[in-house]
Amino acid sequence: MALAARLLPQFLHSRSLPCGAVRLRTPAVAEVRLPSATLCYFCRCRLGLGAALFPRSARALAASALPAQGSRWPVLSSPGLPAAFASFPACPQRSYSTEEKPQQHQKTKMIVLGFSNPINWVRTRIKAFLIWAYFDKEFSITEFSEGAKQAFAHVSKLLSQCKFDLLEELVAKEVLHALKEKVTSLPDNHKNALAANIDEIVFTSTGDISIYYDEKGRKFVNILMCFWYLTSANIPSETLRGASVFQVKLGNQNVETKQLLSASYEFQREFTQGVKPDWTIARIEHSKLLE
């Protein structure tokens, strides 16, 4: 438990974005909405969510299909959106002389359009308020969401590397035992796809919050978090049916193909008096990888 006390509490104490509908724009960038059919059945039925991505490098192609806009667009966000997410910096335009060569690896900016089921959003906010009111006065769903995002990146990386010994204090024993059998039998490219780089996580949402008591009177809270992330793992498209594929241009010549995958992690904590305040992962689902 010492390892969990050092790792998970650190993950679950930082700022995040609210799960309301968020629309971000960067200057002179077109917007494209990802069809909901590309999401997994679990996420569509339970959340009614969608995530859309549009590479900044594909701006020229989209400009031919969309009406011309002004040269500068303001950044739009909902009230209270953290500045770290709301202010997507635009890549500065730079001209090169004949003796100067452009960088070959430039970061590609993405536009994320998030849509949250309003009923689910209200329900999770009410339950988050109950946790704050009755269990933990320091609890914040926005801070928890950001911490869960960091925990997801850390745990998924260890999972892809089959470092199960380092997950013993972070993941429930019965869940870890089942994961060992599934992950070890996966091909290497599927294992690589399990790892989510925190910079490639494009959308995070609170799926559900459960508050319950067991027969002994112990108090538990379960929070289901859903993540969408890009991966460069070489996975045949016919293997992951329904997964979205993007071609991201790096620099002027290199083009990298990425796939949009989804995962669901359920975090659990016992709030019984006298019990250590440790969050553990009670369920791990990687759509189309761990089925």
UniProtKB/Swiss-Prot annotation:
It comes from the Eukaryota. Keywords: Mitochondrion, Transit peptide. Interacts with AFG3L2. Interacts with SPG7. Interacts with SMDT1/EMRE (via the N-terminal transit peptide); interaction is direct and takes place before maturation of SMDT1/EMRE. It comes from Homo sapiens (Human). It is found in: Mitochondrion matrix. Its main location: mitochondrion. Residues 1-96 form a transit peptide. The keyword Transit peptide applies. This is m-AAA protease-interacting protein 1, mitochondrial. Disulfide bonds: none annotated. GO terms for molecular function: ribosome binding. GO terms for biological process: calcium import into the mitochondrion; mitochondrial calcium ion homeostasis; protein insertion into mitochondrial inner membrane from matrix; protein insertion into mitochondrial membrane. GO terms for cellular component: mitochondrial inner membrane; mitochondrial matrix; mitochondrion. The gene is MAIP1. Promotes sorting of SMDT1/EMRE in mitochondria by ensuring its maturation. Interacts with the transit peptide region of SMDT1/EMRE precursor protein in the mitochondrial matrix, leading to protect it against protein degradation by YME1L1, thereby ensuring SMDT1/EMRE maturation by the mitochondrial processing peptidase (PMPCA and PMPCB). The keyword Secreted does not apply. PANTHER family: M-AAA PROTEASE-INTERACTING PROTEIN 1, MITOCHONDRIAL (PTHR13333:SF5).
